[in-house]
């Protein structure tokens, strides 16, 4: 097994029982692939597929004028280069976007020509606005901030059948309904009412009988009845009637007369129920026709219109009920044959017939008018309007789009491949007429589609078929970034289309060009609105790498076209069997959004239709193959799937008589030969965050949910430390998040410092004409969206050989390329003087002293100098009211120096604002005359450090509007940036030249020359010494005897010249970007951003947590000498409450503690060996035992001796373990590690009280555990108010830190003071310290005078109460005595 550069430095010992079948896929693939398929930027225009931008353009174009004489056609679109890169956009507050241009063709037709003749064609490129681009890490930079477009889980287009679960009608009768949901267009619903009539409604408007819709599509009553009913045939003979017998139809009925065979034998006696036995006898007797009395016909429904053959008069209409009078009338008219509907109460309801009865429309036109009146009440129905509306509802491609997904879902549901034998004849007839339908088809509805839906719905009401489960993931699909952006772009294009249609009529007369017709503003507005303020475009959670990756893998059921929090019931939020391997059953928010916002499972991906799929290994004849198939929830239902931990023998055959499987969402035991698929990994069902929890299988689900969510809130520590007990996915998360720097190409490290890494690329990885140098600029002390610090640190040394994809620099919360969210702490589970009551945490002072949980937070403070009515504001150092101490930190431009340490209230940027002219007193006039004008007509509006904040200035950025002269500070910042860029280019050039001249030396040494510098003679062989005596660039003056060599030399010279030109050009572009004016908001002349680095040490009140949902607040930081310690004097770092474990049922934390202790002890053992200078072979032997005695074996033999020693020195702080979820370390394996480390079994030791030295009564569980500091810091929450703002109406102090508010003294607090009888304290709280306005002022006066007297008056809130009562027209007055 090949280890990467960073992997071999610290190999994580895995307890997994089986080898990885499928590597974890790239975790951001969903986002990146979706947006790439939307743009298709790298695909040549002719080869672009019809989706994304291409589909949006082709669905709107060509646009024709109203007269049809001019049309605008779309040819292709091009994406330009973005003006600024990601970093520049973030600094300047711009959007990282590409200009979009479309080539369109204006075709003008000759209106006088008899057939379509092109008169004129104009083709032109038109600007269509800007499209935001995705960064390499799957986010967007919008107005300088990173945002994420969250994928949406919405109801798939198609047709769905359901019932109301008996909730609508008091009888509890199930009312069935069907709904056709298009991707775009009107919804069509069909529903039964309690009387079994079928209704339809469009877009949830007023309901109408469904037969109105059937009439509107051109069906008459006879055709409607023939489509949805089978017929019984009768023959009228004089006074009696004969009935064509279909024996099956009689089953279950009670015979109203004796049924006999041809010989007169009674088969079914009168008043007996007809059974299956009777039907068999009738079949055997071959009875085809039986005589029936007239009563048998009464109440039946006529199937077709009956016309008197002589007069042509309609005797009976289809759907008429047979009465005695009608029967006589039919006989009189000489009707011989009669067809009636076959209906019964059990499984052949007369629903369509009943619906026809309540339908008052007479023909197709009347039906369409009725639909028009329902859709457009109050508008007169003209023929054209009625026709246009009806055609536009479901048949027009412009207004209705079922989409390929919708068509696939529709056909699968409405046109089943196999029809059941029990299905009625009318349904079989319908499907035979329609023929088989695949998954493809038109995007609009057809008449057959409507009939098919009604057919399935009627069958459901008849008791055949099943309703759909709307929470099944086969009925919910994911809309990712690309699709959401495409919809938005199309919406913008539709607005453009309307405007273009208007202008096209003028195009011919006014000789317009395409760019005169298209205005890109509506498109830009739609795109800007979507990326800037859509519910699905969210401010990226950037607290740590995991929170970034989880945010991008989130699927939300909320948002436009989705659910709302209030309407979402329990079923939608619940875990569904189809979530298995697709959506994580654990990770979801705890609040009102629970279950509506989910996370993709680790291996999940979306298919071309947007349905979530998960991978399975194919099983053939009990043998597990290496073939991996991705199945969607729709396909999965039909297979029997074994779990990943099913026992397999050496030949890959499933072992055991019965295997635990899943089939159709249920768990079952199946024989090995029935199994068709098998899970790829035990951790397949959970998301990234949940799969980072070791021993997840031992935690209660509620706590696991909290654990998964709290890892996202972990603040990056100053020195990240890898978890001793992990799950093995830490490296994948760190690398895929983009936080750690990966090598783009393999090579040798040429130069390293804290800011950059220069790599000389391997020759075989450099293409012709490419620069063989990669320069990686580290991100240094950059502010994240959550104000945490992003800082990258190189992990390579000069001369290291690295491969493509190797981690060469760590980022925030990563340690040697692995995710490291917290610190490994020595933990003891025991009570300690009540300081760990209610989950509080007791911490050793050593943890704070060693800066273990210290984090750096970066605050951005901004000041702008505007143009005011009284003149421009000025950023300056010249401020009269500031003392020298304040000014000492400012440079001559009035901006703070980098590196200055500042406290609350200190000036960061000096700024003055013009003040309005005021009437001056004579004294002021005199002062003005003496000291000049400047001092009094401006006020100090400098940027100061806000209260409760202190830190170090780490960066300053100055932005100046075009046309305004830059100050010295702004100029020096630009010079520094150019210098840094120039150094990069110089380094690249240096390595390129060095490689080029090394190649020339290899080519020409020993070859003959025709002459050259320093009077080289013809025919002389070139030597290394000769070359060393020349300047490098004079090597090109050597004239080679070999023409081919001369040509190669020339090619190298030209290549170097081109590279130099390219670098010069790049420098000029960069210089132009930096020196041109900045885009600032209107009225802003200059803007200064100051970045403060704030160091936050751990302190009481900070929230901390483990990875198992065990959270608490630091209650006390105890001196190291007072902490409980072990027999050898080692003090513990953290003391936790043991009572927090049993009730929470998160036992995983105890197992982690044990395994962490074994890890540390093994590390100590290795460290002891290294300090004793043990031989590499001895170290290798111990490592073999650790890595290969159990769990997944590691290839120690592939490491050289020096690599083994380096690995061992990295392991001396603890051997990192991986215990993958659901496949982790067993109890015996932990015990084996204890034994190897030389620890006593049981994991408990005697601790001694640090204060007294006495041993505690019982042994205590002690071990190492990964602990996180969460982004709920006491510094951000706690504040104190002295004086501050008051609420306008109640005159009480405001609440909250942002408003500098006070602490609320509420009703219950008042009770507490009342209970103590503290009357004066209470009076003070409710009056002068709150809303007694006059009393407050008097208190201030008395404090100033040095007195301590309180004169409490009337609280303002009482006056408010009085006024409110008066507003209710009640006269209330306060009598004072």
From Swiss-Prot:
Keyword Transferase belongs to the record: yes
EC category: transferase
Enzyme Commission number: 2.7.7.6
Disulphide bridges: none
SUPFAM superfamilies: beta and beta-prime subunits of DNA dependent RNA-polymerase
InterPro entries per UniProt: DNA-dir_RNA_pol_bsu_ext_1_sf, DNA-dir_RNA_pol_bsu_external_1, DNA-dir_RNA_pol_su2, DNA-dir_RNAP_su2_dom, DNA-dir_RNAP_su2_hyb_sf, RNA_pol_bsu_bac, RNA_pol_bsu_CS, RNA_pol_bsu_protrusion
GO cellular component: a single term: DNA-directed RNA polymerase complex
Summary of subunit composition and partner proteins: The RNAP catalytic core consists of 2 alpha, 1 beta, 1 beta' and 1 omega subunit. When a sigma factor is associated with the core the holoenzyme is formed, which can initiate transcription.
NCBIfam families attached to this UniProt entry: PRK00405.1, rpoB
HAMAP family: RNApol_bact_RpoB
Family of this protein: Belongs to the RNA polymerase beta chain family.
Cited function: DNA-dependent RNA polymerase catalyzes the transcription of DNA into RNA using the four ribonucleoside triphosphates as substrates.
Protein name, UniProt field: DNA-directed RNA polymerase subunit beta
Native source species: Aromatoleum aromaticum (strain DSM 19018 / LMG 30748 / EbN1) (Azoarcus sp. (strain EbN1))
């Amino acid at each position: 097994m090949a280890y990467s550069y960073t992997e071999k430095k610290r190999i994580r010992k895995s307890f997994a029982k089986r080898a990885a079948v499928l590597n974890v896929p790239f975790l951001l693939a969903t986002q990146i692939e979706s947006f790439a398929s939307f743009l298709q930027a790298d695909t040549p225009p002719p080869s672009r597929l019809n989706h994304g931008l291409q589909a949006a353009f082709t669905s709107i174009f060509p646009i024709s004028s109203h007269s049809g004489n001019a049309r605008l056609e779309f040819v292709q679109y091009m994406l330009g280069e973005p003006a600024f890169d990601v970093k520049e956009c973030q600094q300047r507050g711009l959007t990282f976007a590409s200009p979009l241009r479309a080539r369109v063709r204006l075709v003008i037709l000759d209106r006088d020509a008899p057939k379509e003749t092109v008169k004129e064609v104009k083709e032109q490129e038109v600007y269509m606005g800007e499209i935001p681009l995705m960064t390499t890490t799957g986010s967007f930079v919008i107005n300088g901030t990173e945002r994420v477009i969250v994928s949406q889980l919405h109801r798939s287009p198609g047709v769905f059948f359901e019932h109301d679960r008996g909730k609508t009608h008091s009888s509890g009768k199930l009312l069935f309904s069907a709904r056709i949901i298009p991707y775009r267009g009107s919804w069509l619903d069909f529903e039964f009412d309690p009387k079994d009539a079928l209704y339809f409604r469009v877009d949830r408007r007023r309901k109408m009988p469904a037969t109105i819709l059937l009439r509107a599509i051109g069906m008459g009553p006879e055709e409607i009845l023939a489509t949805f009913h089978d017929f019984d045939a009768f023959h009228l003979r004089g006074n009696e009637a004969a009935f064509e017998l279909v024996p099956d139809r009689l089953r279950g009925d009670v015979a109203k007369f004796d049924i006999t065979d041809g010989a007169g034998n009674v088969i079914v006696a009168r008043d007996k129920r007809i059974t299956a036995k009777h039907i068999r006898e009738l079949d055997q007797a071959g009875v085809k026709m039986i005589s029936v009395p007239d009563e048998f016909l009464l109440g039946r429904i006529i199937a077709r219109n009956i016309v008197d053959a002589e007069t042509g008069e309609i005797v009976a209409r289809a759907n008429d009920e047979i009465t005695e009078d009608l029967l006589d009338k039919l006989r009189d008219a000489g009707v011989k044959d009669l067809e009636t509907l076959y209906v019964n109460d059990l499984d052949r309801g007369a629903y369509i017939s009943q619906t026809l009865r309540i339908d008052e429309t007479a023909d197709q036109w009347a039906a369409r008018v009725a639909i028009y009146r329902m859709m457009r009440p109050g508008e007169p129905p003209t023929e054209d309007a009625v026709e246009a509306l009806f055609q536009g509802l479901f048949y027009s491609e412009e207004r209705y789009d079922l989409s390929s997904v919708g068509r696939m879902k529709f056909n699968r549901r409405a046109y089943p491949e196999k029809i059941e034998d029990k299905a009625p004849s009318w349904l079989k007839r319908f499907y035979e007429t329609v023929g088989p339908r695949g998954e493809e088809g038109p995007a609009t509805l057809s008449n057959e589609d409507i009939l098919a839906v009604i057919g399935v719905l009627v069958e459901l009401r008849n008791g055949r078929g099943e309703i759909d489960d709307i929470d099944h993931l086969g009925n919910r699909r994911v809309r990712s970034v690309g699709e959401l952006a495409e919809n938005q772009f199309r919406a913008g294009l539709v607005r453009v289309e309307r405007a273009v249609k208007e202008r096209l009529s003028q195009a011919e007369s006014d000789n317009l060009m395409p760019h005169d017709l298209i205005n890109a503003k509506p498109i830009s507005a739609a795109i800007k609105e979507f990326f800037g303020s859509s519910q699905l475009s969210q401010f990226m959670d950037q607290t740590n790498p995991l929170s970034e990756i989880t945010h991008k893998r989130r699927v939300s059921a909320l948002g436009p076209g989705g659910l709302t929090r209030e309407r979402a019931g329990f079923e939608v939020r619940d875990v569904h069997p189809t979530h298995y391997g697709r959506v994580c059953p654990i990770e979801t928010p705890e609040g009102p959004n629970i279950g509506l916002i989910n996370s993709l499972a680790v291996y999940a991906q979306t298919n071309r239709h947007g349905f979530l799929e998960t991978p399975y290994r194919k099983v053939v004849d009990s043998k597990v193959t290496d073939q991996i198939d991705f199945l969607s929830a729709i396909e999965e239902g039909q297979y029997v799937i074994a779990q990943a931990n099913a026992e397999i023998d050496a030949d890959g055959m499933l072992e055991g008589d019965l295997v635990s499987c899943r089939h159709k969402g249920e768990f079952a035991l199946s024989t090995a030969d029935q199994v068709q698929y098998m899970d790829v990994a035990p951790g397949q069902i959970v998301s990234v965050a949940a799969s980072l929890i070791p021993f997840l299988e031992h935690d209660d689900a509620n706590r696991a949910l909290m654990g998964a969510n709290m890892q996202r809130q972990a603040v990056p520590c100053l020195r990240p430390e890898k978890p001793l007990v992990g799950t093995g996915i830490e490296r994948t998360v760190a690398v895929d998040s983009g936080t750690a720097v990966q090598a783009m190409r393999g090579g040798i490290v040429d130069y390293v410092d804290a800011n950059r890494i220069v790599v000389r690329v391997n020759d075989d990885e450099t293409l012709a004409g490419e620069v063989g140098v990669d320069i990686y600029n580290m991100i240094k002390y950059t502010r994240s969206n959550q104000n945490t610090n992003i800082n990258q640190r190189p992990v390579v040394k000069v001369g290291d050989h690295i491969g493509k994809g190797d981690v060469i620099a760590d980022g925030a919360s990563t340690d040697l390329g692995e995710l490291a969210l917290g610190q490994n702490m020595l933990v003891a589970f025991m009570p300690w003087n009540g300081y760990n009551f209610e989950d509080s945490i007791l911490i050793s002072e050593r943890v704070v002293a060693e800066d273990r949980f210290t984090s750096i937070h970066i605050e951005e403070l901004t000041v702008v100098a505007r143009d005011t009515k009284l003149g421009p504001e000025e950023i300056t150092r010249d401020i009269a009211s500031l003392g020298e101490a304040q000014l000492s930190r400012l440079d001559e431009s009035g901006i703070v120096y980098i590196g200055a340490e500042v406290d609350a209230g200190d000036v960061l940027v000096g700024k003055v604002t013009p003040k309005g002219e005021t009437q001056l007193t004579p004294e002021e006039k005199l002062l003005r005359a003496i000291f000049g004008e400047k001092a009094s007509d401006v006020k100090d509006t400098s940027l100061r450090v806000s209260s409760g904040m202190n830190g170090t200035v780490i960066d300053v950025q100055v932005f100046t509007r075009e046309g305004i002269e830059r100050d010295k500070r702004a100029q020096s910042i630009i010079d520094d940036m150019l210098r840094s860029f120039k150094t990069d280019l110089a380094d690249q050039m240096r390595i390129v030249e060095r490689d080029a001249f090394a190649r020339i030396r290899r080519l020409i040494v020993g070859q003959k020359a025709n002459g050259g510098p320093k009077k080289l003679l013809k025919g002389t062989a070139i030597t290394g010494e000769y070359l060393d005596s020349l300047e490098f660039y004079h090597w090109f003056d050597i004239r080679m005897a070999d023409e081919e060599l001369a040509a190669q030399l020339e090619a190298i010279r030209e290549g170097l010249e081109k590279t130099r030109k390219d670098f010069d050009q790049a420098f000029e572009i960069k210089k132009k970007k930096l020196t041109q004016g900045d885009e600032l908001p209107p009225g802003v002349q200059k803007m200064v951003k100051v970045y403060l680095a704030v160091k936050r040490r751990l302190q009481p009140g900070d929230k901390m947590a483990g990875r198992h949902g065990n959270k608490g607040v630091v209650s006390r930081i105890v001196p190291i000498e007072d902490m409980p310690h072990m027999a050898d004097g080692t003090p513990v770092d953290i003391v936790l409450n043991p009572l927090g474990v049993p009730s929470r049922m998160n036992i995983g934390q105890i197992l982690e503690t044990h395994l962490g202790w074994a890890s540390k002890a093994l590390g100590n053992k290795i460290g002891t060996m290294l300090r004793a200078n043990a031989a590499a072979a001895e170290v290798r032997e111990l490592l073999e035992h650790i890595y290969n005695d159990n769990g997944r074996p590691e290839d120690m033999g592939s490491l050289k001796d020096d690599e083994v020693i380096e690995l061992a020195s990295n392991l001396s702080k603890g051997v990192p373990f991986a215990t993958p979820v659901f496949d982790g370390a067993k109890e015996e394996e932990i015990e084996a590690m204890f034994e190897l480390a030389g620890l006593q079994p049981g994991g408990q030791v005697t601790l001694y009280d640090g204060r007294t030295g006495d041993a505690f009564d019982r042994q205590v569980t002690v071990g190492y555990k990964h602990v996180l500091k969460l982004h709920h810091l006491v510094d951000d929450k706690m504040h104190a108010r002295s004086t501050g703002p008051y609420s306008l109406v109640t005159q009480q102090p405001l609440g909250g830190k942002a408003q500098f508010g006070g602490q609320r003294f509420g009703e219950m607090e008042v009770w507490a003071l009342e209970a103590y009888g503290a009357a004066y304290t209470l009076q003070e709280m409710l009056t002068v310290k709150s809303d007694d306005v006059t009393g407050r002022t008097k208190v201030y006066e008395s404090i100033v005078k040095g007195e301590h007297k309180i004169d409490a008056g009337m609280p303002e809130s009482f006056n408010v109460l009085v006024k409110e009562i008066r507003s209710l027209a009640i006269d209330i007055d306060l009598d004072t005595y």
